[in-house]
């Protein structure tokens, strides 16, 4: 790979170093990695030195003054691991997520040095413009962040990362919807599933553009490519990877297309598993994409918002959903609030909530990796409780303002609380969720 990066110093002080994240280095045991061949800064030779695991430092030949920019050229090889992953390949399906050497974020406490950890979405990046040329063998189709402007050249503006997928077996379903080119890429005979994902994408864009603010890009690609076990999807700017574990075609194969077979899963709920993964990852275009956050230090911020987005989708489009005994998202949010407050619901006493929204991915990995998903529910229930107190319309107005306020920047928990305390008396509610 040949990479040219124009880095702008917005820190307010001179910089003698710039830190970088080389995520492929976390996959060396599976054959992945980044091999840096050459680095230069404004034409002068430089060196990337490992600081900690996937974090590297580039010493600048001269200090970069505040509000000035520098051009950094790199040449490096990316080794793609032979694993089923958001970064990996299997059976001529290549997923290239988080493969680019990207600058670390300089925050209020200095450089954010956060090595990759194999839980959640261990990435933290800032907004940038990308201009990427991709060469693939004849017969391969590419699904990427942004838009292909000329053959093999892809451009994306004001996005937080760049990713792509490639395969020689993709079928593409495409539709232009309200000015957005929607594309679903898939392998194999799952046309019905691809169509359902496309329909869910259209409904998600309608709903979220109203609830959060207009979708600001003109493409959205959804790739049914398969990820690791237990991971239903992964978000990238204008690109979503989905694991087609649940397929519409399964219902035909099981002979329960009409839902009459009591031995199989409820048809409504089974299809909801497809819809929920799709609408959740699309919601990340707003929460992670437009409104950024440190997904390592405070993963609840985007995951909680996107879990709440699932609730909005469910309430809007799936009002008569048969949950096959599992309970609706609203039921789960209400149960979580009972766990937090110690209240009963429908005569049932719930276990005490012990989920700490302040936990980082490192905390979850060390102490309770199986419990990590609890932040989705607790974070989502917080949004739900605020909506209940404000009322739906006032809350949506405030939610759109929240997105506008932090658009193309980042938000942390303190800023989140300050914003919402300005919209309602949530001090007691926050005291419950952060106790």
Positions of the model-derived regions?
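A surface-exposed beta-strand-loop module
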Residues: 32-92
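Asparagine-centered strand-capping/turn motif at beta-strand->loop junctions
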Residues: 7-11
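Solvent-exposed beta-hairpin/edge-strand motifs
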Residues: 15-45, 135, 139-140
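Juxtacatalytic substrate-recognition/specificity segment
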Residues: 132, 173-285, 289-298
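Alpha-helical scaffold elements that line and support the substrate/ligand-binding pocket
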Residues: 283-292, 306-310, 378-390, 395-396, ...
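Extended, low-hydrophobicity, Ser/Thr/Pro/Gly-biased non-transmembrane segments
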Residues: 75-165, 169
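Acidic/His/Gly-enriched intrinsically disordered linker/tail segments
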Residues: 303, 307-381, 389, 406, ...
């Amino acid at each position: 790979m040949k990479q040219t990066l124009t880095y702008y110093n917005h820190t307010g002080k001179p910089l003698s170093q710039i830190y970088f994240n080389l995520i492929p280095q976390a996959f060396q045991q599976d054959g992945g990695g980044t091999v840096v061949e050459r680095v230069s800064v404004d034409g002068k030779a430089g060196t990337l030195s490992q600081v900690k695991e996937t974090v590297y430092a580039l010493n600048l030949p001269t200090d970069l003054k505040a509000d000035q920019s520098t051009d950094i050229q790199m040449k490096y090889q990316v080794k793609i691991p032979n694993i089923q992953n958001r970064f990996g390949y299997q059976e001529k399906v290549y997923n290239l997520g988080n493969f680019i050497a990207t600058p670390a974020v300089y925050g209020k406490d200095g450089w954010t040095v956060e090595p990759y950890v194999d839980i959640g979405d261990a990435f933290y990046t800032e907004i940038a413009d990308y201009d990427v040329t991709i060469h693939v063998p004849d017969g391969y189709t590419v699904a990427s962040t942004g838009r292909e402007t000329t053959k093999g050249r892809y451009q994306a503006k004001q996005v937080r990362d760049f990713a792509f997928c490639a395969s020689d077996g993709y079928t593409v379903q495409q539709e232009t919807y309200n000015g957005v080119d929607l594309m679903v890429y898939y392998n194999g005979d799952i046309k019905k599933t691809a169509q359902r994902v496309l329909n869910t994408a259209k409904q998600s864009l309608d709903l979220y553009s109203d609830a959060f603010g207009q979708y600001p890009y003109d493409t959205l690609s959804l790739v049914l490519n398969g990820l690791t076990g237990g991971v239903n999807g992964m978000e990238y700017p204008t690109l979503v990877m989905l694991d087609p574990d649940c397929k519409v075609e399964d219902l035909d194969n099981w002979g329960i297309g009409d839902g009459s077979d009591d031995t199989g899963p409820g048809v409504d709920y089974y299809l909801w598993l497809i819809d929920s993964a799709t609408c959740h990852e699309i919601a990340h275009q707003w929460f992670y994409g437009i409104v950024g956050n440190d997904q390592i230090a405070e993963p609840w911020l985007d995951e909680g918002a996107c879990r709440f987005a699932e609730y909005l989708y469910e309430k809007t489009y799936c009002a008569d959903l048969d949950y096959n005994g599992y309970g609706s998202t609203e039921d789960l949010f209400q149960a979580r609030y009972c766990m937090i407050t110690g209240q009963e619901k429908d005569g049932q006493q719930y276990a005490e909530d012990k989920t700490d929204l302040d936990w980082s991915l490192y905390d979850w990995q060390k102490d309770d990796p199986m419990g990590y998903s609890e932040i989705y529910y607790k974070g989502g229930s917080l949004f739900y409780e605020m909506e209940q107190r404000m009322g739906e319309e006032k809350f949506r107005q405030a939610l759109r303002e929240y997105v506008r306020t932090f658009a193309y920047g980042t938000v942390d928990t303190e800023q989140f609380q300050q914003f919402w305390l300005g919209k309602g008396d949530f001090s007691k509610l926050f005291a419950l969720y952060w106790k």
